């Protein structure tokens, strides 16, 4: 039985899942909008939102935790210098998941994942 087991396996090993969501979170913070499948988008929320919450309080320990989870100095800088300040007054719900139809080929449900209150002006195609 699967009672009280949280998270989706997504037909991957645990190390593959961890690496995939780490890379997806870095891409999300870099571009502020990514397109992925709906189940991956829902799981990405569990990885990305705690990182933004961590970035709201700037400390060396929090920066080290963020680097451990993203492995990117540039993204850690953006998290603490831009995103942490942008969402300082927001209590949560930093991501928006928008369904965008089905993928050609396997008919998988697709979704855009974007940061709420992101500056508008970039094209959607650039993030894909």
Curated annotation (Swiss-Prot):
Tell whether Cell membrane is among the UniProt keywords: no
Spell out the coiled coil positions from the record.
none
Q: What is this protein called?
A: Large ribosomal subunit protein bL17
Q: Name one GO biological process term.
A: translation
Higher taxonomy? Bacteria, Pseudomonadati, Pseudomonadota, Gammaproteobacteria, Pseudomonadales
Record's family?
A: Belongs to the bacterial ribosomal protein bL17 family.
Q: Which keywords does the record carry? A: Ribonucleoprotein, Ribosomal protein
How does the annotation summarize its subunit structure? Answer: Part of the 50S ribosomal subunit. Contacts protein L32.
The GO terms describing molecular function are:
structural constituent of ribosome
Q: Does the keyword 4Fe-4S apply?
A: no
Checking PROSITE patterns in the record gives: RIBOSOMAL_L17 (PS01167)
Give Gene Ontology CC terms: cytosolic large ribosomal subunit
Q: Which organism does this sequence originate in? A: Pseudomonas syringae pv. tomato (strain ATCC BAA-871 / DC3000)
């Amino acid at each position: 039985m699967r009672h009280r087991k949280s998270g989706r396996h997504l037909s991957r090993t645990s190390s593959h899942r961890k690496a995939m969501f780490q890379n997806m979170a870095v891409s999300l913070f870099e571009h502020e909008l990514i397109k992925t499948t709906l189940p991956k988008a829902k799981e990405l929320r569990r990885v990305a939102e705690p990182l933004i919450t961590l970035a709201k309080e700037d400390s060396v320990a929090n920066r080290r935790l963020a680097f451990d989870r993203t492995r990117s100095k540039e993204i850690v800088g953006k998290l603490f210098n831009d995103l942490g300040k942008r969402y300082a007054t927001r209590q949560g719900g930093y991501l928006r998941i928008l369904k965008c139809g089905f993928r050609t080929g396997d008919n998988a449900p697709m979704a855009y994942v974007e940061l709420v209150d992101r500056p508008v002006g970039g094209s959607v195609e650039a993030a894909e």
